[in-house]
Amino acid sequence: MLIPSKLVNEQFDDRYFDVVDALNEARQIYFRNNNLIERITTGIESKTPFIIGETGFGAGRVVVALMEFVKKSGLRNISIEYNSVELYPLSPERMLDILSGFKDRVGEEIDALVETYRSIDITVAGWHSAKIQKSFGTIDLNLWIGEALEMVESLEKSCDVWFLDGHSPKKNPSIWRPELLMAIGEKTKQGGTCSTFTVASDVKSALIEAGFILNKYPGCGGKKHVLQGVKY
């Protein structure tokens, strides 16, 4: 399949997301496989934020998909802390161009993300925080500009779930290296989860070492299987 050049990250010669149905891929791999709605509902009832960690912010596709997903759930008073990392941040204009293929489906969510992203000085390394306020509640976006291991080690709170969404292990092995996945395990709550599109044996071994019990789920977007893990 021909991949549009605008979807390719030149740093890794790899696409930012699946070109078949990237929004559905995010919903299935990261949201449904992690029982997000049920777990976010528990957070609403206990008045505690649901904490997400992500490796590989890219064009913000997963954030856009998340906004659509929770909006359709009908939940209100949602509080999400979304912690992500990007070593090579895009300009807001490039982000908008990459996401433009979804404009007819999630235009409102794309506009909300890009407007929020414009408030971040992507030329400065370290943490940047901004708030996305929607009818369903609030997403506190915390974006680390820099290296993923530094981001994970600097987190003050452990996460309820991790979306492992970096470029493929063959294209960007550093974001799948054992010491990073071990640190992610250490910054995951007991009973917390992670999920990813890759079933590479090295990644599976590192996640098991990091304390996750792995489950294999049916894939989507051309992937036969995907992984989900539970921290014990």
Q: Where are the regions a protein language model picked out?
A:
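Conserved beta-strand/loop positions that form the S-adenosyl-L-methionine
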Residues: 53-55
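Glycine-rich SAM-binding Motif I of class I
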Residues: 59-64
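S-adenosyl-L-methionine
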Residues: 96-155
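Conserved beta-strand signature within the Rossmann-like core of class I S-adenosyl-L-methionine
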Residues: 161-164, 190-198
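A short glycine-rich, Lys/Arg-flanked "PGG" loop and its adjoining helix->strand segment in the class I
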Residues: 174-190
